[in-house]
């Protein structure tokens, strides 16, 4: 199954939520009509109450699209989360947040996760001084993240850092030196530090059936 490369607003409208697929420099509602479903009849589509299954499925689809994962990848993360000690839903979000592409995004080196993934795949990122081009690489507490000299010179990276600073986007669990294009992954985030608009319990319920 190929990765989706179509209009990102279409995905956001389908889920009725900001999937962080576009730069936060402009308000999302000025770019995507979230209240309008995609398709020719999206503006007039009837809104009915979703079944429990449909609600769970929509939440899973939303999170998959936020992190840019295919179903098999996402299911594998869930399986891994279910074998770890603690809350399965929280474990799942922590695994997703500690992906290298997500950490690069959280540090403000890219305005979106897809842009961060491209930086990683093009060998623009190092972890503890070693080049890593695997977006799914799991970052550990204390890891030092840095951009290559070539990547640091890219205008899009410099613009991303400006946007991150203006909107105070970097979370407390990363430490960034924007002048040196480096960052430290301080610790795996707690649930209180993770996205509040995600209901991971619905995903656990879906996969537990």
UniProtKB/Swiss-Prot annotation:
Residues 98-161 form the S4 RNA-binding domain. SMART domains: Ribosomal_S4, S4. It holds the Pfam family Ribosomal_S4. Gene3D superfamilies: Ribosomal Protein S4 Delta 41, Chain A, domain 1, RNA-binding S4 domain. GO terms for biological process: ribosomal small subunit biogenesis; translation. PROSITE patterns: RIBOSOMAL_S4 (PS00632), S4 (PS50889). Keywords: Ribonucleoprotein, Ribosomal protein, RNA-binding, rRNA-binding. It comes from the Bacteria. Transmembrane segments: none annotated. GO terms for molecular function: rRNA binding; structural constituent of ribosome. One of its GO terms (cellular component) is small ribosomal subunit. NCBIfam families: PRK05327.1 (NF003717), rpsD_bact (TIGR01017). Belongs to the universal ribosomal protein uS4 family. Part of the 30S ribosomal subunit. Contacts protein S5. The interaction surface between S4 and S5 is involved in control of translational fidelity. One of the primary rRNA binding proteins, it binds directly to 16S rRNA where it nucleates assembly of the body of the 30S subunit. This is Small ribosomal subunit protein uS4. It comes from Stenotrophomonas maltophilia (strain K279a). The gene is rpsD.
């Amino acid at each position: 199954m190929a990765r989706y490369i179509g209009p990102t607003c279409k995905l956001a409208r389908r889920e009725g939520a900001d999937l962080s697929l576009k730069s936060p420099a402009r308000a999302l509602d000025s770019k995507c009509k979230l209240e309008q479903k995609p398709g020719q009849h999206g503006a007039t589509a009837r809104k009915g109450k979703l079944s429990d299954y449909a609600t769970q499925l929509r939440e899973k689809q939303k999170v998959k699209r936020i992190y840019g994962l295919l179903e098999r990848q996402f299911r594998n993360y869930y399986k891994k989360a279910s074998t770890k000690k603690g809350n399965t839903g929280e474990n799942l979000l922590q695994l997703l947040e500690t992906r290298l592409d997500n950490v690069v995004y959280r540090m403000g080196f890219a305005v979106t996760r897809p842009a961060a993934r491209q930086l990683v795949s093009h060998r623009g990122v190092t972890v503890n001084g070693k080049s890593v081009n695997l977006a799914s690489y799991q970052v550990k507490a204390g890891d030092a993240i840095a951009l290559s000299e070539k990547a640091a010179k890219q205008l899009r990276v410099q613009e991303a850092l400006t946007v991150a600073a203006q909107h105070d986007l970097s979370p407390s669990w990363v430490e960034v030196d924007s002048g040196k294009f480096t960052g430290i992954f301080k610790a795996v985030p707690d649930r209180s530090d993770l996205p509040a608009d995600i209901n991971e319990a619905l995903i656990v319920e879906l996969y537990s059936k």
